[in-house]
Amino acid sequence: MDAADDTPAITDRELLQAGFRYGMALSHSVQEAEDLVQEAWLNLTRRYGAVASKALLFTTVRNLFIDQCRRRKIVHFESLDQPEPPAVPVPDAEEPGLQGDVAALLGVLRPAEREAIFFHYYEGRTAEEISLLTGQPRGTVLSLLHRAIIRLREAALSSPAAPRCNQWLLFFVSSL
């Protein structure tokens, strides 16, 4: 019996949840994430009959997101020389507490930075693994992570809702 037989099979529900979390990291919108996962799932089941792995689902979701960005032309090029201070939107009243604060802070990141943060801190992947998944050089991934952490710190400290960002949130972004 080899090591591959020892790992439990991932269920469709777990795949969908992981795909949705990844879609949220890319799009930062519940509706777009749901649409991305649904379209990816449909494409994969039509083509292969089933979704074989998380990697295949993530790749399909990412490609669909890139296609949507190209169609909408929402890819923003930002100068890295003198970045503007990020403006953190005030969280909705429907999202009180830490969840709303984290969502607002992640909203200041570019999609590429959110993707790197998602893979590194939520999925527990190394920079090398992220570079293989996204097709970017390892140095670019490290730069994205570094810039994202700096932007999160600045946003958390300069937010008008900084007192709401309680000490847990400040601990999170200062310890990254």
Name each region found by the language model.
Residues 20, 41, 110, 114, ...:
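C-terminal flanking helix
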Residues 15, 144-147:
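Residues within the DNA-recognition helix of helix-turn-helix
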Residues 1-21, 31-34, 45, 114:
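A short, charge-rich alpha-helical start-of-domain segment used by transcription regulators
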Residues 52, 59-80, 95, 154:
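Arg/Lys-rich amphipathic alpha helix in sigma70-family domain 2
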